[in-house]
Each structure stands twice: as structure tokens, then as C-alpha cells.
Amino acid sequence: MHPQQDFYDILQAVTVDCKDNGECFTVIDRVAAVERILEKTDYKLISRQPLALLYAKRPLREGDRVMLISSHIDCVYDNCFCADGGDCLRGTFDNSFTNAALLCNMVHDCLSDNVVVAFTGNEESDSQGAVQTVVALGQMGCEVASALVLDVTNEGWESGALFTLENDLGIDILTGYNIISSLEEYDGRFAFKHNALPDESWDYADYGIPSLTLCVPVGGELHGDAGVMLRKESALEYCNVLSLLASLLC
């Protein structure tokens, strides 16, 4: 389990603005927050692209087989906020929530050494951050075994799902079986949607990378400045499921 207060502190820190113009970041508050949070961890910035920050625990070498976790940091909100709403959190969480969940796993060293983390921009328009990530890893001579994309969704909110699995693209049958088997304790508490709305998994799959999206269900308009509601129970379980899926996709 991940320390609850650590997660909430990180979520508060990264629920700040981040914009791009399709070529580079133009508002970098969240970029700065990510860099600050990771300063005292084992993770090093291995590639800075105009629309992506790539982190790993060790330098990559040609021929390395890596597992990619991708969480976009761009947002469309005019005003970002994070508030406590009792059993729920309320805020502009597309996509600061998954940024925080990923950072929490990194800070507490819950991911394998062969994981590469990409904080990407431009997802809300053309996903150029994802494209730059693939190109950068290709230039390093790495093989990307799989990609786990992190995002938020309205799917599963009404049914009380803790998380959803979406857009499984190119995941082999054995890996899929292992994933479902490992989630037995969540039986009835997560939703699965094979063909969901487009996200970065589609872009990684276009490059032949087996991809899967882990989403957290929220209530409300995803891109509205009034924010969304997110169950606290979902928040902490999402962090745990993230590290579990990462270990199975490595």
C-alpha cells in the first residue's frame, strides 16, 4: 500500500497548469512540479523532448528491452484545483490524478528497473508527446515490450468501479489471462472496455507496441473547469493496481 498522505500531497502539487502549442510546452508549472518531486529519487531524466520527459532508474543501452508507462501532463483547464469532498476528491484531474499515482509509485520505488516513464504533452490534441517518446526510445536502440497508458474516464463511475481497463491493443492472450487472474480480488469492482475513446494507447499501438490503458473513473465533465468527483477508495487502489500491471507487462 502507498502512504495516503504522500499521495494527496503529490496530487496537490501536480494539479497545476500545463499547456503546449503542439511543438513545445508553453506553460510548465506541472513540468516543474514533476521535476521537483523526482529530484531526490533514483529516477533520472534520460531524455527531454519538446513535448515529453522520459525517466528511468538507470541509463539505457542499445538493445535494452523496456516497459513504458505513459501519463500525459497537458491539460485544457483555465483554472486547476484539488479539493477534499469527503468520500471523494474534487478537482481538475485530467490528467493530474494519474500523474500523481505514477509519481507516488516512483517515489516509493514500486516499479521494476526496466520501466521507462514518459510524462507527455499534446495528448489533448495530436499526441505528439507520445510520438516523440517512441522516436526517442528508438534512437536509443531500445525495444519497447509494452506500454501502459494512464488516464481518467467517465466509464465505470455510475457502477462504482474502482478502475477500468481500456483499449487493450496487441496484448497477447497469456498476458491478458495473467492480468485478469491477478485482479480476482477486485471482482465486480472494475470495468473492462475493449474499444474505448482514443488515447495514447492508440498511438503506441500504431508503432507496433502492445498497449493497455488503466483509467480511474470520475463523475462530471472531464474537461470542465468545475472539476470532477473521484472516489478516495479508487485513488489508493489505482496506485496499487498500477504497480501490479506494470510488473505483469514487463
PLM segments and residue spans:
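Active-site-adjacent substrate-binding region
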Residues: 157-250
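Hydrophobic/aromatic beta-strand patches that form the interior of the parallel beta-sheet core
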Residues: 67-69, 118, 146-148, 210-214
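A non-catalytic alpha/beta surface segment that caps or lines the substrate-entry region
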Residues: 9-62
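Active-site metal-coordination/substrate-binding segment of hydrolases
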Residues: 40, 47, 63-119
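A short acidic, glycine/proline-enriched capping/turn motif at secondary-structure boundaries
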Residues: 60-61, 74-77, 124, 155
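Short glycine-enriched loops at secondary-structure junctions
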Residues: 71-75, 150-154, 217
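Acidic/histidine-rich catalytic neighborhood of metal-dependent amide-processing enzymes
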Residues: 89-174, 180-181, 188-203
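A short glycine/serine-rich beta->alpha loop
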Residues: 19-21, 85-93, 192, 229
